């Protein structure tokens, strides 16, 4: 880990200052996978009240009236029209060419071109971030559920609970000890490191979705490796610290670097550097809930 200052292309922030400023948001990273669950009341447009909780999904603007008061024929027809072949959501690709050719040959996707500023890895980093803040285990297809009643088994913060689980005590299957050093388990012996696996080759993970494909599994493995290197780094600098303190500091460093990647690499690709700089300098002005939670509008629509 380099200690020299690194200036970002935003021109106003250096790496050291950013990592130091993140400390207040990462004080509780060494223990439980859930933050202390906070609650607040919300109110709908019709005057109904409900709980907002960190471990539940919610609505971004609960006071707004419904777009459509009830599901009827007109609404159904409108939705079918939007999604029909040739409709406004149809990219009009030549589906007969097959999925591989449509991905590999840009000439076949003139109506749906690749993003010139995104690498292929951007997609999978986005998937990794999503798995760190949302995991709905209870909802079922075609079974309407109020978002306030839907359990989110991930914390509504970028704290890498999808990597660390509940920590060494609550998720011991993820960890191994090297003397006083608590490290995440990795399998070695092949061409590259791999996630730890059971005899049936299923991965031992805090979030099973992070073995859905080789790219997301590679990202998970990279964070395991980074944490383990951070453990060695902290142990060398603080030889008198016990295993818990070394682990907590290594997790803090890993999480701070993760935050740096989100702010300075990922977000500018999607919302532009100017908006990132505006938020960093002027703060949030519109969405400032008293209790942190993931809005269902973000989880199910905007982030997609």
List the predicted regions and their residue ranges.
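N-terminal secretory signal peptides
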Residues: 1-14, 39-41
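Mobile, glycine-rich extracellular loop/lid and propeptide segments
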Residues: 213, 218-230, 234, 253-254
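Extended amphipathic alpha-helical segments with heptad-repeat/coiled-coil character used for oligomerization
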Residues: 251-304
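Carbohydrate-associated surface elements
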Residues: 43-194
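Acidic/His metal-coordination segments adjacent to aromatic residues that form catalytic metal sites
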Residues: 188-214
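Inter-helical turn/loop segments and adjacent helix faces that build the functional surface
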Residues: 230-247
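N-terminal export signals
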Residues: 17-40
């Amino acid at each position: 880990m380099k200690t020299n200052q690194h200036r970002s292309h935003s021109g106003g922030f250096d790496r050291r200052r950013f990592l130091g400023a993140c400390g207040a948001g990462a004080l509780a990273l060494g223990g439980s996978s859930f933050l202390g669950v906070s609650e607040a009341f919300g109110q709908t447009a019709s005057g109904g009240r409900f709980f907002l909780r960190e471990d539940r999904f919610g609505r971004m603007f609960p006071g707004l009236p419904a777009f459509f008061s009830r599901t009827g024929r007109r609404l159904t027809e409108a939705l079918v029209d939007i999604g029909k072949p040739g409709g406004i959501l149809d990219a009009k690709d030549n589906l007969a060419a097959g999925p591989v050719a449509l991905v590999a040959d840009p000439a076949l996707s003139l109506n749906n071109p690749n993003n010139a500023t995104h690498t292929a890895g951007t997609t999978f980093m986005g998937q990794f971030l999503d798995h760190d803040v949302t995991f709905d285990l209870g909802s079922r297809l075609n079974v309407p559920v109020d978002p306030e009643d839907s359990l989110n088994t991930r914390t509504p913060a970028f704290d890498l609970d999808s990597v660390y689980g509940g920590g060494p005590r609550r998720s011991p299957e993820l960890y191994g000890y090297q003397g006083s050093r608590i490290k995440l388990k990795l399998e070695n012996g092949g061409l590259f490191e791999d996630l730890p696996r059971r005899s049936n080759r299923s991965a031992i993970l805090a979030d099973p979705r992070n073995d859905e494909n080789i790219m997301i599994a590679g990202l998970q493995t990279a964070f395991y490796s980074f944490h383990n290197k951070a453990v060695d780094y902290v142990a060398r600098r603080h030889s008198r610290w016990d295993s818990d303190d070394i682990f907590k500091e290594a997790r803090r460093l890993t999480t701070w670097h993760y935050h740096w990647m989100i702010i300075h690499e990922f977000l500018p690709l999607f919302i532009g550097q100017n908006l990132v700089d505006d938020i960093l300098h002027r703060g949030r002005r519109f969405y400032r809930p008293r209790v942190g939670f993931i809005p269902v509008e973000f989880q199910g629509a905007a982030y997609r």
